Amino acid sequence: MREIVHLQTGQCGNQIGAAFWQTISGEHGLDGSGVYNGSSDLQLERMNVYFNEASGNKYVPRAVLVDLEPGTMDAVRAGPFGQLFRPDNFVFGQSGAGNNWAKGHYTEGAELVDQVVDVVRREAEGCDCLQGFQITHSLGGGTGAGMGTLLISKIREEFPDRMMATFSVVPSPKVSDTVVEPYNATLSVHQLVEHSDETFCIDNEALYDICMRTLKLSNPSYGDLNHLVSAVMSGVTTCLRFPGQLNSDLRKLAVNMVPFPRLHFFMVGFAPLTSRGAHSFRAVSVPELTQQMFDPKNMMAASDFRNGRYLTCSAIFRGKVSMKEVEDQMRNIQSKNQTYFVEWIPNNIQTALCSIPPRGLKMSSTFIGNSTSIQELFKRVGDQFTAMFRRKAFLHWYTGEGMDEMEFTEAESNMNDLVSEYQQYQDASISEGEEEYLEEEEPLEHEE
């Protein structure tokens, strides 16, 4: 069956990854050590998308955990689901990348990468029909950004025809974890544009906003944020893991979502999001899910789609949902918000339906949008990059690891190109071709 091999790199990637495995294990009825004690055959039916069956009714995630320092992995191992993972699949160095992209991509990470690729190869050989890879990482640090992108390109070399999806935590507009974040992020985007098939952009600030505004948590922890991300990650692959009336998988998603190969950076959202106290006061219906999932406040990346237009979207519904109702709602959304959808891709919302809802909910929906407004995010990082790079601030950390300034310049211009490509398609309209045609004809009228 269509297996997915999961990689998590760096501190952020490992923490999101751990939350994801917790969510997935719950959905499939596994306890913290991978033993099945679920209630329904449906949970077992396609368990092998993410899990290998070992002896004694134990299931082992197809996950590879990577970091350049042992700290985060020790925490994962000590956590509630630490006994789930195969011990050989923890690959870590001792030195750390110290938020330095060059260390992750060229020096420290490069020493460790072959070891990781061996583990990935072994996982891939254990699959009947490997569908692709998913990787969780952040773009602002050293290991997740530098080594994460190195891994992506190595895996790309070895498995050129398999899907590569990344869940990438992009730098937030106002909150920055490290000063050199703009450098690391720009160098990473430079890699992702070329080597990833679909990148789901998530940022902490947007997640904080959702936690505070919608979930009414007064001081959200990273645990709360990661829980949100894991809900989306689970939603994206739900069709692979449970039966549904309208299936979707990583490849179908990419075919429907990526009109031009470089423009594969998606915004994601999840519904229903309600504060813990308000659960019992709301009935969740398809119109309400649709309303909420197209709400800018629900997007997990800090760019407002009202400033751009959707090239394509995908909506994945879970639970007992009527197909007709979903189609009506989608048509409704499209006709009401015509200005936010490009008119030169006529039916640009893809829907998928899966009959099994997530734990504790009657129905839910996952939203994935390819909006031109994501350029705001790249523009913001690009501006910060330019400000520092003009003065060559902090560059010695990177050149000291053997990087060339040229590479910075290339990454910068690649990101600027990406921004202007998004802008170009945002401004494009159906009638452009026709207008030129009319201009040629006009002079004839005046001669009469």
UniProtKB/Swiss-Prot annotation:
- Region Disordered: list its residue ranges: 425-448
Q: Mind telling me what this protein is named?
A: Tubulin beta chain
- Assembly mode: Dimer of alpha and beta chains. A typical microtubule is a hollow water-filled tube with an outer diameter of 25 nm and an inner diameter of 15 nM. Alpha-beta heterodimers associate head-to-tail to form protofilaments running lengthwise along the microtubule wall with the beta-tubulin subunit facing the microtubule plus end conferring a structural polarity. Microtubules usually have 13 protofilaments but different protofilament numbers can be found in some organisms and specialized cells.
Compositional bias (Acidic residues): 432-448
> Is Acetylation there in the keyword field?
no
Q: Which family does it belong to?
A: Belongs to the tubulin family.
Q: Where in the cell is it found?
A: Cytoplasm, Cytoskeleton
An example Gene Ontology molecular-function term:
metal ion binding
Q: Which gene encodes it?
A: benA56
